[in-house]
């Protein structure tokens, strides 16, 4: 460690650790095994729910609509990739104390975590636009959201999430790490890694804020605008039944937005502004729940709130093979 500290005085020397140590949840190391139990249970529920939903939407012709395409073939698959990138590694830390992660593997995990969450945010935005077209322009729905348009929207969302995250590993690689290689976290997250650097991280912070604006803030603004127009259109409906139907078609999506963005914004602001007021253990727990809780609850929320999915699930378990 003294050698690392002395090297910081020489800006021409670039120090890159061969690996990082993911220390888990700081202050709660003795109860890691107990913390892992609900996380593992949620992960199993998450796998069953999302894989089952992907299969159901593929299998059931009555669910071959844009809304379910976004949810089943996009949101569920992205959730599967995101959680599988982080949770098995966290369970290895909790159960077997396998805390070491290669430097490049850490950068890869960081890229995938941020990239997939960026894509997920875009999918939620597209789902809001889908609801806007369905409620405000119901007669044009089938001609507006055609398969080519859906494919282009999904591709644009994916490319935005991936391309904006590509600089993160390179911004981290340029930094010298001469203090410690111990990360108080269960996975490699951009701010957790760069805080270990002994050089200025101003560029990393600025770029991170820019990405947050281009993805999180932009998507929230689009979602808010969509639901403002939806609310305006629903209120103008003359029939109370029509208004009720319009609102009921949005409740599942609104629930998904809340359980996704609330922990996401907590994690974002805690990293940057809550270092002295928010306990590190709380921050790490919420960061894990942010990646695991929404994907676990989404199939349940959509199954409860969406009549077509409920009917398809019942139909599937009754063994009815006919197309819906």
From Swiss-Prot:
GO molecular function: G protein-coupled receptor activity; olfactory receptor activity
The entry's keywords: Cell membrane, Disulfide bond, G-protein coupled receptor, Membrane, Olfaction, Receptor, Sensory transduction, Transducer, Transmembrane, Transmembrane helix
Record topology, Cytoplasmic segments: 55-62, 130-148, 227-246, 305-324
UniProt superkingdom: Eukaryota
Location of the protein in the cell: Cell membrane
Protein name: Olfactory receptor 52N5
Gene3D superfamilies in alphabetical order: Rhodopsin 7-helix transmembrane proteins (1.20.1070.10)
Membrane topology summary: Multi-pass membrane protein
One Pfam family here: 7tm_4
Disulfide-bonded cysteines: 106-198
Record family assignment: Belongs to the G-protein coupled receptor 1 family.
Described purpose of this protein according to its UniProt entry: Odorant receptor.
GO CC list: plasma membrane
Gene giving rise to this polypeptide: OR52N5
Extracellular side: 1-33, 85-108, 170-205, 268-283
Spans traversing the lipid bilayer: 34-54, 63-84, 109-129, 149-169, 206-226, 247-267, 284-304
């Amino acid at each position: 460690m003294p050698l690392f500290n002395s090297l910081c005085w020489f800006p021409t020397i670039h120090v890159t650790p061969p690996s990082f140590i993911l220390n888990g949840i700081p202050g709660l190391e003795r109860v890691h095994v107990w913390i892992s139990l609900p996380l593992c249970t949620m992960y199993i529920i998450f796998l069953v729910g999302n894989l089952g939903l992907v299969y159901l939407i593929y299998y059931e012709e009555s669910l071959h609509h844009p809304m379910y395409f976004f949810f089943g073939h996009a949101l569920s698959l992205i959730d599967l990739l995101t959680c599988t990138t982080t949770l098995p590694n966290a369970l290895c830390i909790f159960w077997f104390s396998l805390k070491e992660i290669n430097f490049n593997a850490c950068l890869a995990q960081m890229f995938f975590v941020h990239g997939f969450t960026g894509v997920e945010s875009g999918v939620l935005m597209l789902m809001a636009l889908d609801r806007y077209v369905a409620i405000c322009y119901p007669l044009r729905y089938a001609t507006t959201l055609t398969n080519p348009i859906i494919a282009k929207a999904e591709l644009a969302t994916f490319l935005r999430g991936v391309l904006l995250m590509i600089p993160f590993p390179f911004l981290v690689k340029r930094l010298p790490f001469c203090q410690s290689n111990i990360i108080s976290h269960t996975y490699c997250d951009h701010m957790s890694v760069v805080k270990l650097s002994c050089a200025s991280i101003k560029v990393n912070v600025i770029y991170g804020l820019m990405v947050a604006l281009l993805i999180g803030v932009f998507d929230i603004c689009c979602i808010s605008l969509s639901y403002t127009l939806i609310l305006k259109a629903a209120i103008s409906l003359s029939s109370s039944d029509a208004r009720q139907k319009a609102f009921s078609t949005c409740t599942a999506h609104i629930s998904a937005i809340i359980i996704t963005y609330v922990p996401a914004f907590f994690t974002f602001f805690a990293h940057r502004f809550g270092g002295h007021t928010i306990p590190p253990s709380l921050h790490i727990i919420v960061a894990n729940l942010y990646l695991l809780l929404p994907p676990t609850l989404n199939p349940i929320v959509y199954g409860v709130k969406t009549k077509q999915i409920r009917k398809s699930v019942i139909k599937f378990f009754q063994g009815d093979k006919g197309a819906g």
